[in-house]
Amino acid sequence: MERAEKREFVTELNEVFKASGSVVVAHYAGVTVAQMNDFRSKMRAAGGTVRVAKNRLAKIALQGTESEGMTDLFKGQTLIAFSEDPVTAPKVVMDFAKTNDKLVVLGGAMGATTLNAEGVKSLATLPSLDELRAKLLGLINAPATRVATVVAAPASQLARVFSAYAKKDEAA
């Protein structure tokens, strides 16, 4: 890479670190190209991205971001997985790490909070932002549904009473 390319790459990576909801750093030594391509496609499908960067350039890109505390993680062959949703990147990385022991999660960051490997693992167990929104909407809609049922119940009961009187009159 030429100097200008490196500057552009660092700037791009810096913007990624600033905009991402979460960042995960992992060792990937021993992961085959096919496995890495599979991992990248899974991450892309979930809405995240996987990048491999020189450690020195990644450390420079971290300067001036909230995630600056994770510079110590960049040793050896490291990859960076990130996503806008704070749960997506950790979830996909941990799922892939379960099936591939060559991928070792080192840690990561969520905003200004630096996470160790256990922190990333626990973050991966949380529901995604969309799932939380769906649960919240369900909780909000549940009382409205109950109110509608209660309001509609007397009308249906009244209709049954009228129907019973009509049948009684017909029988007599």
From Swiss-Prot:
Keywords: Ribonucleoprotein, Ribosomal protein, RNA-binding, rRNA-binding. GO terms for molecular function: large ribosomal subunit rRNA binding; structural constituent of ribosome. One of its GO terms (biological process) is translation. GO terms for cellular component: large ribosomal subunit. Pfam families: Ribosomal_L10. InterPro entries: Ribosomal_uL10, Ribosomal_uL10-like_sf, Ribosomal_uL10_bac, Ribosomal_uL10_bac_type, Ribosomal_uL10_CS_bac. Part of the ribosomal stalk of the 50S ribosomal subunit. The N-terminus interacts with L11 and the large rRNA to form the base of the stalk. The C-terminus forms an elongated spine to which L12 dimers bind in a sequential fashion forming a multimeric L10(L12)X complex. NCBIfam families: PRK00099.1-1. Belongs to the universal ribosomal protein uL10 family. Forms part of the ribosomal stalk, playing a central role in the interaction of the ribosome with GTP-bound translation factors. This is Large ribosomal subunit protein uL10. The gene is rplJ.
